[in-house]
Amino acid sequence: MRASLLLLCLLSIGYTQAQIDTVVVRVDSMFESKLHRKLYDNRTNVKYHLDERGNVRDIFVFLATLEEIGTGHKLYGVRIDQRFNRAIFTDAPASNAEYIDEDELPKFIGYLKMIRDEVMKNDHTPQKYTEYRFYTRAGIMLECYTGVNRWRCVLHYEIAKMPTDTYISNPERLSELLAVMEQIQAEIAENRKRK
């Protein structure tokens, strides 16, 4: 009897894993404050849906929707992560998910546009090293260095408590990331209209 039950559980888990490409159980920022207890007490009742929204070279951008227990209201966050780190996305409670909350998207997109249109093209003090830093609520940092006739842009965030840097150091890559962010913003707005 126990062997049959164990086999049934393993088959169920295998089927579920075949249907889910990426699962995040620990979430931070807006999800943490509102649903922290529910996430740990009722994991099976929380629905995760992550869609890959384009490959920005070695950056993956995800749109994650989390359905709140009871009301079914969906909260949105954008996750940024590097390629080849999917093994970290397990149900291990130590795994951190860094999100840009949906209400911060316009500000984040504005920062990217500022870097593209002003910082990158109009370095007002080319002989002086200048640094720009922008933070999201969850702690993701968008950092840009300029000066001495060169510039670079980097995203700082953490995966499983380990600091991670992803460089966006050419105009094409920056424009591609900006386009993906704008696409996600439009998609969230469209989803909100349907409710």
Q: Could you tell me what each predicted segment is?
A:
Residues Q19-K195:
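Positively charged, low-complexity terminal tracts
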Residues M1-T22:
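Bacterial Sec-dependent N-terminal signal peptides
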